[in-house]
Amino acid sequence: MLNQKNGFAVALVLVFAIASFVLTRPQSAPAVSGVSGLMTLTTMAQTATPYDVAMANQKPTLIEFYADWCTTCQSLSPTITALHEQWGDRINFVMLNIDDPQWASQVNQFQVNGVPNLTLLDNSHAVTDTFMGNIPKSLLESELTELLS
């Protein structure tokens, strides 16, 4: 009888533990596969404003420091693509791969210590804000609106 009660108690604890895990997990954005995320990053890098061009004009700038191997960078790429489509005529969208030695001085200058790192510059190229990680689109939209005001 005692073994039966112990077995029931263990089963009940397991059910509650599993239910708690499933019900309390954060809802995530739709998954981006590694291949499609990398392809999107590559395409974005090819269509981004070159760093030298951005530093020579008077537009505000969003610099994304990324790495091809970074899965968070890959999952953020649809958000950055959508923002680029919406704001690209008024804001420079620059992408710098931290693994490319040519960007080492910019990585140091902007104190990048993780990816994705999004650095916002005003039209005089002063840093206004920096974000790291998977940033919600709504927050970035708000920041870009403020950057243009």
Map each language-model feature to its residues.
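A short beta-strand-turn-helix
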Residues: 42-59, 104
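Thiol-based oxidoreductase modules, predominantly thioredoxin-like and allied folds used
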Residues: 89-104
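N-terminal targeting signals for export/organelle localization
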Residues: 1-42, 149
